[in-house]
UniProtKB/Swiss-Prot annotation:
The keyword Transferase applies. The keyword Metal-binding does not apply. The lineage of its organism: Eukaryota, Viridiplantae, Streptophyta, Embryophyta, Tracheophyta. Residues 63-137 form the U-box domain. Pathway: Protein modification; protein ubiquitination. PROSITE patterns: U_BOX. Functions as an E3 ubiquitin ligase. ARM repeats lie at residues 179-219, 221-260. This is U-box domain-containing protein 30. It catalyses: S-ubiquitinyl-[E2 ubiquitin-conjugating enzyme]-L-cysteine + [acceptor protein]-L-lysine = [E2 ubiquitin-conjugating enzyme]-L-cysteine + N(6)-ubiquitinyl-[acceptor protein]-L-lysine. Keywords: Repeat, Transferase, Ubl conjugation pathway. It comes from Arabidopsis thaliana (Mouse-ear cress). One of its GO terms (biological process) is negative regulation of response to salt stress. SMART domains: Ubox. One of its GO terms (molecular function) is ubiquitin protein ligase activity.
Length: 448
């Protein structure tokens, strides 16, 4: 259970129901910024019909004053009650604490001489006032950005040249910053307006802004279908190769969204240009934030044979293998998935086998990251050792494969994974005498 360390509240302890009995002046507290009130005024007029629970959920604020937080749940309190120790909690949470048989104060662990809880009306009113002000301000800002988003959409229908770029840039900033603006753009038919700006003669200045906006929106099937036009995809691929790092990432994310659509056609991503652009992102040592978006796109498109053939032809296999040690767990799993998919075809298996670092790097992964990574690495090793057992099996054993396989077999991994490990272990043992293989396994007794 999370525990909360109370902070010294500089005279704010005296909420009704505990402490030194001081009465907190709400107007002064908020106006003076004691609890982070809205700039420029006191409590103001609050609509008493506003629902506190709804406001807390919709605002989803991070900078909430600590005195509003329940020490048990670490969430804002909606019905604060105070114990005899002077500590305040959310009513529901403290009752759960009592129902578990605890007779102590959760924060101080002080034994309670009275389990009565007193509603802290002063704190409740302060919480309600603070959230109400934030909520009303949010609503006003939302209305402002909604109106501005609609204005910009109207401008885009007739703007040309630099005026169009400026309008798109402003709209991008608005939709990235405001959820309501994103909803408004979609509801007002803005997706079709923005998508129509992508075409064979679209400048990259316009295209990069359009893509940045589109990846921020919740696109429906019709919108994605419209973006699957070859001319639009071609422009997006061009920007994936020639745009800024941010634009390249956005292009990869947008194409990935299209790939996941039911009506997607494999030929749309079966191009040297797309794959070269993605591999550049993967290998870019200056901008590592592009690795994940690129691999997250390579994963779904690698299930298509024509894509796998192109990947082999552009030399993607050794490039993927060589970056394995530098990847974080998520990206490592994606890269191993792609390499395993490439092993589906003979040309892919040969390319994976011929990559000098395939065996040492994949052996290193076994039982070190996740079961999925172990599964993909094991599948890759099986493919290359089966393809060229006399060449690959001894090399794999020399870098510690046999001992790793025994670890997999003895672990709590999936039964199919253990079976594959046993088969690969048997395959590797064929090239050694029993005594020699036992020593390679780092065992002191014969394998039964």
């Amino acid at each position: 259970m999370p525990m909360f360390q109370p902070l010294k509240r500089d005279g704010l302890i005296g909420f009704e129901g505990g402490g030194d009995g001081q009465v907190l002046d709400l107007d002064t507290a908020v106006k003076d910024g004691v609890l982070g009130g809205v700039n420029g005024g006191g409590v103001g007029v609050v609509d008493e019909k506003l629902d506190l629970k709804k406001m807390i959920k919709e605002l989803d604020l991070q900078d909430i004053p600590s005195v509003f937080i329940c020490p048990i749940s670490l969430e804002p309190m909606q019905d604060p009650v105070t114990l005899c120790t002077g500590q305040t909690y959310e009513r529901l949470n403290i009752h759960k604490w009592f129902n578990l048989g605890h007779l102590t104060c959760p924060t101080t662990m002080q034994e309670l001489w009275d389990d009565t809880v007193t509603p802290n009306k002063t704190l409740h009113h302060l919480i309600y006032t603070w959230f109400s002000q934030k909520y009303v301000l949010m609503k006003k800002r939302s209305e402002d950005v909604q109106g501005r988003a609609i204005e910009i959409l109207g401008t885009l229908k007739k703007a040309k040249g630099q005026a169009r770029v400026h309008a798109l840039s402003e709209l991008k900033q608005i939709v990235i910053a405001h959820l309501m603006a994103r909803k408004t753009v979609v509801e007002e038919g803005g997706v079709s307006v923005i998508s129509s700006l992508l075409g064979p003669f679209t400048s990259h200045a316009v295209g990069s802004e359009v893509v940045a906006i589109l990846v921020s929106l919740d696109l429906d099937s019709d919108s994605k279908s419209g973006l699957m036009q070859p001319a639009k995809v071609s422009l997006i691929v061009d920007m994936l190769n020639d745009g800024s790092n941010e634009t390249k990432i956005n292009c990869a994310r947008l194409i990935r969204g299209l790939v996941e659509e039911k009506g997607f056609r494999a030929e749309l991503v079966s191009s040297h240009s797309l794959l070269v652009g993605l591999m550049r992102l993967v290998k870019d040592k200056r901008h590592r934030n592009g690795v994940s978006p690129a691999l997250r796109l390579l994963k779904p498109i690698s299930v298509h044979k024509q894509v796998r053939s192109l990947m082999v032809s552009i030399g993607a296999v050794p490039q993927l293998v060589d970056i394995l040690p530098s990847l974080d767990p998520e990206c490592l799993e994606l890269a191993l998935f792609v390499l395993d998919a490439l092993c589906t075809d003979v040309e892919g298996r040969v390319a994976v086998k011929d990559s000098a670092n395939t065996i040492p790097y994949t052996v290193r992964v076994l039982m070190r990251v996740s079961e999925n990574c172990t599964n993909y690495a094991l599948s890759i090793l099986w493919s290359v050792c089966k393809l060229a057992p006399e060449e690959c099996s001894p090399l794999a054993v020399e870098v510690g494969l046999a001992a790793k396989l025994l670890l997999v077999i003895q672990s709590g991994c999936d039964a199919a994974l253990k079976q594959r490990s046993a088969e690969l272990l048997k395959l590797c043992s064929l090239h050694y005498s029993d005594t020699m293989f036992i020593s390679k396994c780092k065992l002191t007794r014969t394998i039964q």
